[in-house]
Amino acid sequence: MSRIGIFYGSSSGVTGKVAEKLAELLGEERCDLYNMEEDFVDFDDMLKYDHLLFGCSTWGSGEVQNDWRDPLLELDNEKPDFSGKTIALFGAGDYVSHGEQFVSALGVLYDKFKARGAALVGSFPTDGYTYEYSFAVRDGKFVGLPFDKINEVDKTDERLERWIAVLQEEFLPA
């Protein structure tokens, strides 16, 4: 059974908790968790997996979470090849305080890793979300799973279960 690498940045712990929940739902025995601040060394950590989940919250006016900033600069400079890798994205946002850039960091990750050859899967419907704008919306869907653990905590578990069903079809290795 092929392993899944789950890489996440989490300033307040929210994205980390969702990463742990995803590992539980996908089967902890097949998942390796990497906190970008504590565990990430270089892209070889990611490239050893064919299937990856990246978790990143959005801060301020659409910026990626701090732990992703340097690795994304390195991605641009080193240009590692992610061809043959399948990536799904998830991330926290706050539609009340930052509805003008709701989970836009996912759009940044999407563009960066797509440009490096990765196949990105796991898009999620925008239905049921309230926001003004999101850079993470492409072709009418979010590029990954957005969640708002501040204003919509009651919807997170149901959305996770729906996203797992999407991943069962598009992502999960045999």
UniProtKB/Swiss-Prot annotation:
SUPFAM superfamilies referenced in this protein's UniProt entry, alphabetically: Flavoproteins
One of the record's GO molecular function terms: FMN binding
Domain Flavodoxin-like as annotated: residue spans: 4-168
Needed cofactors: FMN
Pfam families: Flavodoxin_1
InterPro entries per the UniProt record, alphabetical: Flavodoxin, Flavodoxin/NO_synth, Flavodoxin_CS, Flavodoxin_lc, Flavoprotein-like_sf
Entry keyword set: Electron transport, Flavoprotein, FMN, Transport
Induction annotation: Is the predominant flavodoxin expressed when A.vinelandii is grown on nitrate as nitrogen source.
Binding positions for FMN per the UniProt entry: 10-14, 89-122
Protein family membership: Belongs to the flavodoxin family.
NCBIfam families, alphabetized: flav_long, PRK09267.1-5
Function as written in the Swiss-Prot or TrEMBL entry: Flavodoxins are low-potential electron donors to a number of redox enzymes. AvFld 1 is able to donate electrons to the assimilatory nitrate reductase of A.vinelandii to catalyze the reduction of nitrate to nitrite.
Record-given protein name: Flavodoxin 1
Taxonomic source organism: Azotobacter vinelandii (strain DJ / ATCC BAA-1303)
